[in-house]
Amino acid sequence: MTLEKLQGSTLDQSEQVVIYGANGWMGRSALDFISALKPTIAKEKILLIGSKSCFLNLNGSNHEIFAPSTGITSIREGAIFFNAAFLRRELLQKMTPEEYLHKNNEIVALAKSAIKEKKLLSFINLSSGVARDFDHEFQIKPTDEYSRLKKSLEIEYSEYCSQNQTALVNCRIFSLTGRHLNEFDNLALSSFVYQAKSKNQIDVKSPSTKRTYVDATDLAGTLLSIAALGKDVSFDSGGELVTMRQLAERVLAGLGKDVSALALGDIESPDYIGEFEKFNSLASEMGQNLLGIEDQITNTLNAFN
Protein backbone atom coordinates (compact mmCIF):
# COMPACT_ATOMS: atom_id res chain seq x y z
CA MET A 1 0.00 0.00 0.00
CA THR A 2 1.42 3.41 -0.92
CA LEU A 3 1.83 6.10 1.71
CA GLU A 4 -0.76 8.30 0.00
CA LYS A 5 -3.35 5.49 0.11
CA LEU A 6 -2.43 4.69 3.68
CA GLN A 7 -2.89 8.30 4.73
CA GLY A 8 -6.28 8.27 3.09
CA SER A 9 -7.32 5.12 4.90
CA THR A 10 -6.19 6.63 8.21
CA LEU A 11 -8.72 9.39 7.72
CA ASP A 12 -11.41 7.38 5.98
CA GLN A 13 -11.54 4.71 8.68
CA SER A 14 -12.01 7.30 11.39
CA GLU A 15 -14.83 9.77 11.79
CA GLN A 16 -12.36 12.38 12.96
CA VAL A 17 -8.75 12.91 14.07
CA VAL A 18 -8.41 15.00 17.23
CA ILE A 19 -4.98 16.51 17.88
CA TYR A 20 -4.70 17.69 21.48
CA GLY A 21 -1.64 19.86 22.06
CA ALA A 22 -1.88 20.97 18.43
CA ASN A 23 0.55 23.87 18.72
CA GLY A 24 3.42 21.76 20.07
CA TRP A 25 6.16 19.81 18.35
CA MET A 26 4.28 16.52 18.01
CA GLY A 27 0.93 18.19 17.42
CA ARG A 28 2.25 20.13 14.44
CA SER A 29 3.99 17.01 13.17
CA ALA A 30 0.71 15.07 13.25
CA LEU A 31 -0.98 17.89 11.35
CA ASP A 32 1.88 17.83 8.84
CA PHE A 33 1.28 14.15 8.17
CA ILE A 34 -2.47 14.48 7.69
CA SER A 35 -2.20 17.69 5.66
CA ALA A 36 -0.24 15.78 3.02
CA LEU A 37 -3.72 14.96 1.70
CA LYS A 38 -5.91 17.51 -0.03
CA PRO A 39 -6.37 20.41 2.41
CA THR A 40 -10.16 20.26 2.12
CA ILE A 41 -10.24 16.62 3.21
CA ALA A 42 -7.86 17.31 6.07
CA LYS A 43 -9.92 20.24 7.32
CA GLU A 44 -13.08 18.12 7.37
CA LYS A 45 -11.45 15.40 9.46
CA ILE A 46 -9.17 17.28 11.86
CA LEU A 47 -10.08 18.90 15.18
CA LEU A 48 -7.23 20.86 16.74
CA ILE A 49 -7.28 21.58 20.47
CA GLY A 50 -4.70 23.61 22.37
CA SER A 51 -4.31 25.49 25.61
CA LYS A 52 -6.21 28.44 24.15
CA SER A 53 -8.10 29.50 21.05
CA CYS A 54 -5.82 30.69 18.24
CA PHE A 55 -4.89 30.17 14.60
CA LEU A 56 -1.92 28.17 13.37
CA ASN A 57 -0.34 28.87 9.98
CA LEU A 58 1.30 25.70 8.75
CA ASN A 59 2.58 25.08 5.24
CA GLY A 60 0.74 28.16 3.99
CA SER A 61 -2.65 27.15 5.41
CA ASN A 62 -4.44 28.59 8.42
CA HIS A 63 -5.84 26.11 10.95
CA GLU A 64 -8.09 27.02 13.85
CA ILE A 65 -7.08 25.69 17.26
CA PHE A 66 -9.87 25.47 19.82
CA ALA A 67 -9.60 25.99 23.55
CA PRO A 68 -10.23 22.84 25.65
CA SER A 69 -13.71 23.87 26.81
CA THR A 70 -14.84 24.41 23.21
CA GLY A 71 -12.87 21.64 21.60
CA ILE A 72 -14.17 18.78 23.71
CA THR A 73 -17.76 19.52 22.69
CA SER A 74 -16.78 19.01 19.03
CA ILE A 75 -15.22 15.56 19.42
CA ARG A 76 -17.18 13.00 17.42
CA GLU A 77 -17.91 9.39 18.26
CA GLY A 78 -15.38 7.08 16.60
CA ALA A 79 -12.57 9.64 16.57
CA ILE A 80 -8.85 8.98 16.81
CA PHE A 81 -7.48 11.03 19.71
CA PHE A 82 -3.83 12.04 19.28
CA ASN A 83 -2.74 13.11 22.75
CA ALA A 84 0.26 15.45 22.48
CA ALA A 85 -0.57 17.76 25.41
CA PHE A 86 1.88 17.63 28.30
CA LEU A 87 4.27 19.97 30.08
CA ARG A 88 7.86 19.52 28.98
CA ARG A 89 10.31 17.99 31.41
CA GLU A 90 12.53 21.07 31.74
CA LEU A 91 9.65 23.04 33.27
CA LEU A 92 10.35 21.07 36.45
CA GLN A 93 13.35 23.40 36.81
CA LYS A 94 11.01 26.40 36.96
CA MET A 95 8.12 24.94 38.96
CA THR A 96 7.78 23.01 42.19
CA PRO A 97 6.87 19.33 41.76
CA GLU A 98 3.43 20.13 43.20
CA GLU A 99 2.86 22.94 40.68
CA TYR A 100 4.08 20.74 37.84
CA LEU A 101 1.79 17.85 38.78
CA HIS A 102 -1.19 20.15 39.31
CA LYS A 103 -0.79 21.79 35.90
CA ASN A 104 -0.37 18.46 34.14
CA ASN A 105 -3.46 17.11 35.89
CA GLU A 106 -5.41 20.05 34.47
CA ILE A 107 -4.07 19.31 30.99
CA VAL A 108 -4.75 15.55 30.99
CA ALA A 109 -8.27 16.01 32.36
CA LEU A 110 -9.58 16.67 28.84
CA ALA A 111 -7.93 13.52 27.48
CA LYS A 112 -9.47 11.40 30.23
CA SER A 113 -12.89 12.97 29.68
CA ALA A 114 -12.66 12.26 25.96
CA ILE A 115 -12.01 8.57 26.62
CA LYS A 116 -14.89 8.29 29.09
CA GLU A 117 -17.48 10.34 27.23
CA LYS A 118 -16.82 10.27 23.48
CA LYS A 119 -16.65 6.58 22.44
CA LEU A 120 -13.33 7.03 20.66
CA LEU A 121 -12.04 4.54 18.11
CA SER A 122 -8.53 4.81 19.52
CA PHE A 123 -6.37 6.88 21.83
CA ILE A 124 -2.70 7.64 21.13
CA ASN A 125 -0.60 8.21 24.23
CA LEU A 126 2.79 9.82 23.74
CA SER A 127 4.75 8.48 26.67
CA SER A 128 8.50 8.63 27.27
CA GLY A 129 11.38 6.21 27.41
CA VAL A 130 11.98 7.27 31.00
CA ALA A 131 8.74 5.52 32.02
CA ARG A 132 10.62 2.23 31.87
CA ASP A 133 12.41 3.25 35.09
CA PHE A 134 9.25 2.13 36.89
CA ASP A 135 8.61 -1.11 35.00
CA HIS A 136 10.08 -3.40 37.63
CA GLU A 137 9.23 -3.28 41.29
CA PHE A 138 12.70 -4.32 42.39
CA GLN A 139 14.32 -1.30 40.79
CA ILE A 140 15.19 1.73 42.90
CA LYS A 141 12.60 4.37 42.10
CA PRO A 142 13.99 7.68 40.82
CA THR A 143 12.67 10.92 42.26
CA ASP A 144 12.05 12.53 38.87
CA GLU A 145 8.38 13.50 38.81
CA TYR A 146 8.34 13.53 35.01
CA SER A 147 9.29 9.84 34.83
CA ARG A 148 6.88 8.94 37.59
CA LEU A 149 4.00 10.81 35.95
CA LYS A 150 4.63 9.32 32.51
CA LYS A 151 4.46 5.80 33.95
CA SER A 152 1.35 6.49 36.03
CA LEU A 153 -0.44 7.95 33.00
CA GLU A 154 0.36 4.84 30.96
CA ILE A 155 -1.45 2.81 33.60
CA GLU A 156 -4.37 5.23 33.91
CA TYR A 157 -4.92 5.56 30.16
CA SER A 158 -4.76 1.79 29.78
CA GLU A 159 -7.46 1.36 32.44
CA TYR A 160 -9.65 4.13 30.98
CA CYS A 161 -9.39 2.73 27.44
CA SER A 162 -10.11 -0.83 28.60
CA GLN A 163 -13.20 0.30 30.51
CA ASN A 164 -14.52 2.28 27.53
CA GLN A 165 -13.75 -0.11 24.65
CA THR A 166 -11.18 2.26 23.16
CA ALA A 167 -8.04 0.95 21.48
CA LEU A 168 -4.84 2.25 23.08
CA VAL A 169 -1.71 3.00 21.07
CA ASN A 170 1.03 3.66 23.61
CA CYS A 171 4.42 4.84 22.39
CA ARG A 172 7.43 5.51 24.59
CA ILE A 173 9.40 8.20 22.82
CA PHE A 174 13.18 8.20 23.08
CA SER A 175 14.81 10.74 20.73
CA LEU A 176 13.13 12.89 18.08
CA THR A 177 14.11 15.19 15.26
CA GLY A 178 12.05 17.45 13.01
CA ARG A 179 11.39 20.91 11.72
CA HIS A 180 8.89 21.75 14.47
CA LEU A 181 11.43 21.26 17.27
CA ASN A 182 10.56 23.66 20.09
CA GLU A 183 12.85 22.48 22.88
CA PHE A 184 16.23 24.10 22.36
CA ASP A 185 17.97 23.84 25.72
CA ASN A 186 17.89 20.23 26.88
CA LEU A 187 18.31 18.06 23.80
CA ALA A 188 21.63 16.70 22.54
CA LEU A 189 20.72 17.45 18.94
CA SER A 190 19.74 21.09 19.51
CA SER A 191 22.79 21.55 21.74
CA PHE A 192 25.04 20.30 18.96
CA VAL A 193 23.45 22.66 16.43
CA TYR A 194 23.82 25.64 18.76
CA GLN A 195 27.46 24.85 19.48
CA ALA A 196 28.30 24.40 15.82
CA LYS A 197 26.63 27.69 14.91
CA SER A 198 27.95 29.80 17.79
CA LYS A 199 31.37 28.28 18.55
CA ASN A 200 32.21 26.36 15.38
CA GLN A 201 32.86 23.45 17.70
CA ILE A 202 30.79 20.64 19.22
CA ASP A 203 31.68 19.20 22.61
CA VAL A 204 30.66 15.54 22.68
CA LYS A 205 30.98 14.40 26.27
CA SER A 206 29.85 10.80 25.67
CA PRO A 207 30.86 10.00 22.08
CA SER A 208 30.12 6.26 22.23
CA THR A 209 26.63 6.56 23.76
CA LYS A 210 23.94 5.26 21.38
CA ARG A 211 20.50 6.71 20.67
CA THR A 212 17.79 6.15 18.09
CA TYR A 213 16.44 9.17 16.24
CA VAL A 214 13.18 9.35 14.32
CA ASP A 215 11.58 12.28 12.53
CA ALA A 216 8.55 13.50 14.47
CA THR A 217 6.32 13.57 11.37
CA ASP A 218 7.31 9.98 10.54
CA LEU A 219 6.50 8.99 14.11
CA ALA A 220 3.14 10.79 14.06
CA GLY A 221 2.22 9.20 10.75
CA THR A 222 3.06 5.72 11.98
CA LEU A 223 1.03 6.24 15.16
CA LEU A 224 -2.01 7.56 13.29
CA SER A 225 -1.88 4.73 10.77
CA ILE A 226 -1.74 2.12 13.54
CA ALA A 227 -4.51 3.89 15.47
CA ALA A 228 -6.81 3.61 12.45
CA LEU A 229 -6.72 -0.17 12.87
CA GLY A 230 -8.48 0.10 16.23
CA LYS A 231 -6.16 -2.32 18.03
CA ASP A 232 -4.18 -2.11 21.27
CA VAL A 233 -0.47 -1.69 20.53
CA SER A 234 2.43 -0.68 22.76
CA PHE A 235 5.99 -0.03 21.59
CA ASP A 236 9.07 2.17 21.86
CA SER A 237 9.99 4.74 19.23
CA GLY A 238 12.76 3.76 16.86
CA GLY A 239 14.45 5.21 13.83
CA GLU A 240 18.16 5.24 13.05
CA LEU A 241 20.68 4.08 15.63
CA VAL A 242 23.66 6.43 15.99
CA THR A 243 26.35 7.24 18.51
CA MET A 244 26.62 10.78 19.85
CA ARG A 245 29.84 11.17 17.87
CA GLN A 246 28.09 10.15 14.66
CA LEU A 247 25.24 12.55 15.39
CA ALA A 248 27.65 15.44 15.93
CA GLU A 249 29.51 14.57 12.72
CA ARG A 250 26.24 14.61 10.76
CA VAL A 251 25.30 18.00 12.27
CA LEU A 252 28.64 19.46 11.20
CA ALA A 253 28.21 18.00 7.71
CA GLY A 254 24.71 19.46 7.49
CA LEU A 255 26.12 22.88 8.33
CA GLY A 256 29.01 22.52 5.91
CA LYS A 257 31.61 22.36 8.67
CA ASP A 258 34.63 20.10 9.07
CA VAL A 259 34.68 17.21 11.54
CA SER A 260 37.86 18.69 13.03
CA ALA A 261 35.45 20.89 14.99
CA LEU A 262 34.65 17.94 17.27
CA ALA A 263 35.90 17.95 20.86
CA LEU A 264 35.49 14.43 22.21
CA GLY A 265 35.13 13.61 25.89
CA ASP A 266 35.50 10.26 27.61
CA ILE A 267 32.35 9.96 29.73
CA GLU A 268 30.66 6.55 29.56
CA SER A 269 26.91 7.20 29.65
CA PRO A 270 24.27 4.47 29.25
CA ASP A 271 22.61 4.10 25.87
CA TYR A 272 19.15 5.67 25.58
CA ILE A 273 17.31 3.29 23.29
CA GLY A 274 14.30 1.03 23.49
CA GLU A 275 13.16 -1.93 21.39
CA PHE A 276 13.53 0.14 18.26
CA GLU A 277 13.42 -2.78 15.83
CA LYS A 278 9.73 -3.35 16.65
CA PHE A 279 8.86 0.24 15.77
CA ASN A 280 10.87 0.18 12.56
CA SER A 281 9.09 -3.02 11.54
CA LEU A 282 5.67 -1.54 12.34
CA ALA A 283 6.48 1.62 10.39
CA SER A 284 7.45 -0.49 7.39
CA GLU A 285 4.21 -2.48 7.64
CA MET A 286 2.28 0.80 7.69
CA GLY A 287 4.03 1.94 4.51
CA GLN A 288 6.06 4.62 6.28
CA ASN A 289 9.51 5.17 4.81
CA LEU A 290 11.50 6.53 7.74
CA LEU A 291 13.94 9.34 7.03
CA GLY A 292 17.63 8.61 7.52
CA ILE A 293 19.64 10.66 9.98
CA GLU A 294 21.05 13.04 7.34
CA ASP A 295 17.57 14.01 6.14
CA GLN A 296 16.36 14.23 9.73
CA ILE A 297 19.10 16.71 10.60
CA THR A 298 18.38 18.74 7.47
CA ASN A 299 14.73 19.01 8.53
CA THR A 300 15.66 19.86 12.11
CA LEU A 301 17.97 22.69 11.03
CA ASN A 302 14.87 24.44 9.67
CA ALA A 303 13.73 24.94 13.27
CA PHE A 304 16.75 27.18 13.82
CA ASN A 305 16.14 29.42 10.79
Put a short name on every predicted segment.
Residues Y20, I49, A84, F123-G129, ...:
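SDR active-site strand-loop-helix element
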Residues A109-Y146:
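Conserved Rossmann-fold NAD(P)-dependent oxidoreductase catalytic core, especially the SDR/UDP-sugar
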Residues L87-R89, S128-H136, F174-T177:
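Active-site segment of SDR-like NAD(P)-dependent oxidoreductases
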Residues K199-N200, V204-N305:
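C-terminal substrate-binding subdomain of Rossmann-fold SDR/epimerase-dehydratase oxidoreductases
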